[in-house]
Amino acid sequence: MDLEKLKDYQKHIRNFAIVAHIDHGKSTIADRILELTDTVSQRQLKNQMLDDMPLERQRGITIKMNSVEVKYHARDGEDYIFHLIDTPGHVDFSYEVSRSLAACEGALMVVDASQGVQAQTLANTYVAIDDDLEILPVINKIDLPSADIPKTKEEIEEMLGLDASEAAEVSGKTGQGIEDMLEKVVKDIPAPSGDITAPLKALIFDSKYDDYRGVVMSVKIEDGVVKPGDRIKIMNTGKEYEVTEVGVSSPHPVKKDLLIAGDVGYITANIKSVRETRVGDTITDATNPTEEPLEGYRQIPPMVYSGMYPVDNRDYDDLKEALQKLQLNDAALEFEPETSTALGFGFRCGFLGLLHMDVVQERLEQEFDLGLIMTAPSVDYHAIMNDGSTKVIDNPSDLPDAGEYQEVQEPYVKAEIMVLNDFVGPVMELCQRKRGEFVTMDYLDKYRVNVIYNMPLAEIIFDFFDDLKSSTKGYASLDYEITGYRSTDLVKIDILLNKEPIDALSFIAHRSEAQDRARQMTSMLKKLIPRQNFEVDIQGAIGAKIISRATIKPYRKDVTWKIHTGDPDRRAKLLEKQKRGKKRMKAVGRVEVPQDAFMAVLKMHDDDIKGK
């Protein structure tokens, strides 16, 4: 092992992430870099090259960060090794951004020339500044007729505090300016400073499970060297393993003889249990260990909780195993077993937001072929009991009876909404309707305002983002953070089917809205629950008091009217759709309840409740 050669190799490494607001073109820029450097052949090249999860390609968004090694021949005649990490832009996946930045010395901060700086641009820049990274501003989509480069530069300087005079001006679509941008990476982003001769110290920033190789750990080597045959130790657990393979993603796995300080790659060591490695752990040499582990990641607590149950109770163990494998690859997912009288055995899962919840459900159904029932999402409430103790309520059905607690507290957030001047009125109206308290309003420039409200998290997570987009014609962005818990007049609303309470349909609401929401819920369930052979009585109740009611009439005796569908193809389609729907039904008592019914609380928009 020639130390001088390794040191020279290390000097030519550049580790950087691409971060931006959602839809500002990060993945397209990554595609152009792969194309320009011949990392991927023209035949293999496709849009969103680094988005290798089928769900990412379906939705057209980045969900998981992804790293790739790129070789670049610079204008100075030298060859450089780029480790490029593409990151998500949606607020739900901000934890992926913070993890990826820990593996980098620099970041490309991409801003859409037609939209300017947005909420997640600000949030991601602050994370990069906290990590002491070299930030290179990149102005993308300069080929658009609506691109305003001088204005975007002004915003970058005023709002982000970065020097934009030398900002790279690129088009991810056409490839214009990409090579100049890569030259800036060579010149401005520092090489990693790790000590190759020190004991091995590597940070696990991601991992996934492979049926043949076991756990595949994505790592940034901070110090030292690692190669196949080495004995390594996970510092958090103390467990030791023998390295079977090391390599890099380019973008498909490529084996290497060794990884050195500064490299971003992967390690396999025949680790079969998903519990034995955790994102944020430090790997060291078992025979010559480092003394201090690397600073791991701040664990981000879930914002939203939902019950997850297999449609077929026999799939419980398969669901548990699938969640464990997914958790390895998704550090923000939390789950613990729970039992529902209506749905049987399942899990209470914690997510960072509704998009995160949707993605987890779709991945479980697509990648593990599971049929699932999800209950309506809820936030974490605190019940202050009569004896002064605090009970954490992440499932509405667990809220004690009224006489057993002094008060209920709910989480509040500071919501920052960036919006065009023309839409400030509708945004303030929306926030007030959602129980928001106005804090301040900052005029960022002639066109845009940053509006800040304190709001209950429960009001944000359901349909707030959709309502915000519709009330501003899409010209608004949102960022929020939890600020603490406040005492609020909340009540639990139970839903009864034929006088039998269904725990999975319970929800918590502000007392002033309780009756409206209960009425909305019962009428929604009346539409969603199919007719049965008997009458179904749907009731909403606070304690013993019934506050809303709806009735589903039974089938008529003669059901043959169904088969007189004119078009036989249409009839076949309807039957197939009905068959799929029945798979996602649960018998609650004698009543068949579809998946949609458990999510009905999401459909209770404010406008409907207020009769607008």
Swiss-Prot record:
SUPFAM superfamilies in the cross-refs = EF-G C-terminal domain-like, P-loop containing nucleoside triphosphate hydrolases
Which cysteines in this chain are paired by disulphide bridges? none
Q: What is its main location?
A: membrane
Membrane topology summary:
Peripheral membrane protein
- The record lists the membrane-crossing segments as none
Reactions catalysed? GTP + H2O = GDP + phosphate + H(+)
Gene source species: Lactobacillus helveticus (strain DPC 4571)
InterPro entries membership: EF-4, EFG_III/V, EFG_V-like, EFTu-like_2, LepA_C_sf, LepA_CTD, LepA_IV, P-loop_NTPase
For the biological process aspect of GO, one term held by this record is: positive regulation of translation
**EC numbers for this chain:** 3.6.5.n1
State the superkingdom.
Answer: Bacteria
Free-text function comment from the UniProt entry = Required for accurate and efficient protein synthesis under certain stress conditions. May act as a fidelity factor of the translation reaction, by catalyzing a one-codon backward translocation of tRNAs on improperly translocated ribosomes. Back-translocation proceeds from a post-translocation (POST) complex to a pre-translocation (PRE) complex, thus giving elongation factor G a second chance to translocate the tRNAs correctly. Binds to ribosomes in a GTP-dependent manner.
CDD domains the UniProt entry points to: EF4_II (cd03699), EF4_III (cd16260), LepA (cd01890), lepA_C (cd03709)
Q: Where does GTP bind?
A: 23-28, 140-143
Identify the residues that the record assigns to the tr-type G domain, covering every copy: 11-193
Keyword Lipid biosynthesis in record: no
GO cellular component entries: plasma membrane
Q: What is this protein called?
A: Elongation factor 4
A single Gene Ontology MF term assigned here is: ribosome binding
Q: Which family does it belong to?
A: Belongs to the TRAFAC class translation factor GTPase superfamily. Classic translation factor GTPase family. LepA subfamily.
Species lineage: Bacteria, Bacillati, Bacillota, Bacilli, Lactobacillales
- Where in the cell does this protein reside? Cell membrane
Q: Which UniProt keywords apply?
A: Cell membrane, GTP-binding, Hydrolase, Membrane, Nucleotide-binding, Protein biosynthesis
